[in-house]
Amino acid sequence: MQILKIPWFGHKTENKTVECYAVTINKDGTRLASGGLDGNVKIWDLTTINVFYKMADQPHKSKKDSTSTKLEESLPDKSLRRPLCSMSRHNGVVTSLKFSPDGRWLASGSDDKICLIWEKDNTQIAKSFGTDEHDLEHWTVRKRLVAHDNDIQDICWSPDGNLLVTVGLDRSVIIWNALTFEKIKRYDIHQSMVKGIVFDPANKFFATASDDRTVRIFRYYKKLNEYNNYEFQMEHVVVDPFKKSPLTSYFRRMSWSPDGQHIAVPNATNGPVPSVAIINRGNWGSDISLIGHEAPVEVCSFSPTLFQIADTPANEEIKFQTVVATGGQDRTLAIWSTCNSRPIVVCSDIVDSSITDICWSPDGETLYFSCLDGSITGVKFGARELGQPVKEDLIDQQLNRYGADRESTILPESVEQLQLEEQSKDSRAISIRRMMPIQEAKPEQTPPISTPASAAIDIERLRKQTVTMTKSGKKRVAPLLVSTSAAPKNVLQKPLEKKRRTKSSSKISQAAYLLPKMGVQTTVHGIKKKAESMSNDTEVEENNDNDDIGENVMANTNSVSDAALKRQRNRRKRKLMELKYPSSFKYISNLPEGLFNNHTLQNIEINKIYKAHSKHKDISAEISSSTAVEIDEDLVFSVVFRVFDHMRKENEVLGQTSGRIRTTIEVRNGKPWDDDISDRDFDDATKVIVTEEGNDKREYCLFFPFRVQHVLPIILNDVLKYYVLCSFHGSVQIISADTGSYRCPTFELGESVVTMRHSQGYMLVLTSSGLFYSWDLKAMKVTMTGISIAAILNNYEIGGKIVVSPIVRGLEINPQDGSPLVLLDMTNDIYGYSIDLQCWVKTVDSWYYGVGADKDLDVVLTGLVKKSKMSYEEDKVTEKIFTYKFDSSNDLEDAMRKRGQELLDLI
């Protein structure tokens, strides 16, 4: 193995090196293109570079030695020790470069959001004014592809050269027609920046890698009887190896093995260790990881050649191996083989900065890689050092197992299916001959001349054409054969026609573009087919084709769209949120009010408004499902913050003086933990930080294995005693405020808590299902457990298909025994729970407000009575309730006043 570093082989500006981001080699192995921070695309002559390998083969000798002198004389002239040309048409950093499979085109992507298509121009170009040396070659821009909204990170051509895919930081995957360079599709299905793209050498799939920690496998194939018109489907999403992959890498450049069996994906993790994930074709499993790098891996690249394993026994089938090179932020180049569990060679600190791109020569024995230090380094392996290279015919045989030689829309599910299809051709023909009796040949009869009646029959058939609905909601008319013959139809053709019709209706997408009227331009947005205008449905066109992509081939039979699945998920999520945060408790909880919104009620009201102002009778499901604002629970409670004032006692040991201080509790919730223990990290624990005003140091910092939603300080006689922490699933933990130690074991309520109250040493908790729990914290005893509020919420109003429950307007805790006091919005009555009677009692009846019954009550009950009276007066003004009008005599009014006063005396 030889490592070649040439001082002038790289990117420099004014004797200063600049970052180099991309390298690529053409199919002949004669040209290498590089791009970097200087915005230039440089073309290098590999014939000139390879001469230096020959000089490295010879042993080092003195300068006076004649052999060394001859070698130096055989080196290329100093005027050739530079790039053949340097093109500066980009307005930003060149981040990606790829030669087309035939070597004619060179695609370059940049952070100026533009992809340029270059072609070599053989015409002689005069020397530019102000330049010392003119370019030895001239490359010109043929197309400018404009569609991205942010930096282009990677580019890849399909193996047949008919497709070009670009990905970028705008999370878009844009597919171009590589013949006309029109935009075919744009998919924005990734949730974050897309940093890698690779095509299957069998020309059936391509894969994309994104910062959303997923690798998506796309299947594509040509449509039936349509030239260069493709169908795209989502095949699989790989998640497991990338759950904890870092987001610090600039690239995620993948590579597909030349035999089509494996995908090498960088920036994966195996536990806490950086790794390279190997994805198997077919089941898309990712059980294999290449572990050896000490920092995230940026790029992987398979050698384009298969190598024969030398020690294969003679009586066994010849085995092959593939070789992959990996590099990343640890400045290390590693060469791996599929027949070894350890790397063939590891070159540590081979460069001074991160490795950004790797490319192999067509013979598979020389590689070049770029680096952020601006250099381009070459590595050449000796003859048979990696193994015996196999012929291209054997590689084609390996790819033909996956249908590389087929362009049919009938998709093979496995290699065995392709073999069975070949075997079944002859058997199918034999079985048909056995079923059909041998008949003597008869002279052909002249077909009868069609009559006008047959035309009438055809018109009736045309009127009964089959109309199908695609996933995007568009209507399509199935084509019918218009025959001018009056001969009867063949009965045997009916099942075939039905099968074809079903198959054509399962298509997910159709061509969304035609050739533009003004010719093929740089950027083609396409023109919708005029046949779609026949539909009466108005559609809002988006700048992507996400609705046209399918999940997989088997899912086409179900015809379930992504939008429908998304609506189902949102519907289930809303139901869970309504169960977890009932709208009846939104006024008594200190949680954000948006969590308690009843989405069903909101949608019904919005539907009424929409139908009143719209000409359409039916409201679309998309509008109905998107009316309610969704709240991310994890984002809302990522930090829980409480600040409160209290008295602090004097402590001579700690040097604390008595006085009024302010304490802050900050809860930093970790990520939701998975059920799988192996996926849990200590870094994901919830952190509780307690600080005091005026004290630079923290009082203490606690860690919990659950995510905290509620924080309740317990203050007795103006002195802070305890902190009460409650999780999302009803785990209640009481902590001593002085030391941070546990006061008691964790309470498990089994469901989320809506609100918490405390008074005079009592703590009251209300859960999402309406159950009350109360404890005496002084004696550490329970006062009431699992008391349901349903007894006083049994009044409900039915409106259409929904049930409107009464809203709890106020909630307080009785300081005498810790029982709840509840104010209802519908009746304005105040209820309390009697621990002695073990039932709910009506503490204050709003019916007696009309006669002015009054009494001096305690502070807690007085506040609820004021709220009740204000709501009562508001209902009178809005005529929700009607008060009784007394006669001229005051006997009835006096009797009611006495009865109301009697009820108040019982409190």
From Swiss-Prot:
Entry keyword set: Chromatin regulator, Nucleus, Repeat, Repressor, Transcription, Transcription regulation, WD repeat
Biased composition (Acidic residues): 538-550
Subcellular location: Nucleus
Mapped WD repeat ranges: 15-54, 89-128, 147-186, 189-228, 292-346, 350-391
A biological-process GO annotation: chromatin remodeling
GO molecular function, one term: transcription corepressor activity
Keyword Cell membrane: no
Residue numbers spanned by region Disordered: 532-552
Cellular component per GO, a single term: chromosome, centromeric region
Gene3D superfamilies: YVTN repeat-like/Quinoprotein amine dehydrogenase
Cited function: Required for replication-independent chromatin assembly and for the periodic repression of histone gene transcription during the cell cycle.
Stated family: Belongs to the WD repeat HIR1 family.
Protein name as it appears in the record: Protein HIR1
